[in-house]
Amino acid sequence: MNSPFHNIGIVTRPNTPDIQDTAHTLITFLKQHGFTVYLDEVGVRECCIYTQDTDGCHIVNKTELGQYCDLVAVLGGDGTFLSAAREITPRAVPIIGINQGHLGFLTQIPREYMTDKLLPVLEGKYLAEERILIEAALIREGKTAERALALNDAVLSRGGAGQMIEFEVFVNQEFVYTQRSDGLIVSTPTGSTAYSLAAGGPIMQAGLHAFTLVPICPQSMTNRPIAIPDTSEIEILVTQGGDARVHFDGQSFIDVQNLDRIIIRRYHNPLRILHPTDYQYFKTLRQKLHWGEQLV
């Protein structure tokens, strides 16, 4: 096959029904077409791959997938995709998602049509889309204590004590407000159909260069979601945090102390997602959110 890709990485979701069969089909397909296959070591260790399918494949960690591969296929749900994206985006390697999970906003190719949909993509016939990521830094006593990336959102939230937290928000060093609430969601357009949507935030078309600030159960009913350019720097100063945390894509977190500052910016590398040529963003929204179809 004359392909712009040569080394294909595969990330699999552990403890998923039929994941071994899906991986077997994909690995066999790629080998038959002459591609070099790299497997995420976690998937191999968690028995997502039949032992015989690892023959002739390279087994590496997710960071090394970004180093050695020129395309990564994610078999799983959106959670698996989010985890892979944070590891691979720094290497600017494109990702394609195959849905082995449930909702599938990001992993859109049904596994039943996996090889039929992938073949044109591997031949160079695809739609490429760039998605922005969040880069967050936790500043404690004037020093950077932690850093993290997020494709969906960074969420400041109250801890197990259950009490409201209080914090100040600044955009480009301009004071916005003091808020008492259960927390604040800073969402990318990709994350606008996730936690942000459940908290009353707007849906943002995936290609927009914007963030939204979405309060979680604010004490003041006048606190509403705000959309800002993704060139903005967001600063959150925690004044009464209790045992608050900052969560990243709902998969990792940092504990927060009083007077900590969380600085949020757009990450310098966008995530590049590849879609089949028949991909339509609003069709995906209709299917996943069960919107009405055209009447005429």
From Swiss-Prot:
Compartment(s) where it occurs, according to its Swiss-Prot or TrEMBL record: Cytoplasm
Cellular component GO terms, alphabetical: cytoplasm
Query: Coiled-coil intervals in this record?
Result: none
Primary enzyme class = transferase
Question: What is the required cofactor set for this protein?
Answer: a divalent metal cation
Catalysed reaction equations from the record: NAD(+) + ATP = ADP + NADP(+) + H(+)
Alphabetical list of PANTHER family matching this protein: NAD KINASE
Family stated for the protein in its record: Belongs to the NAD kinase family.
What name is this protein filed under? NAD kinase
Species annotation? Neisseria gonorrhoeae (strain ATCC 700825 / FA 1090)
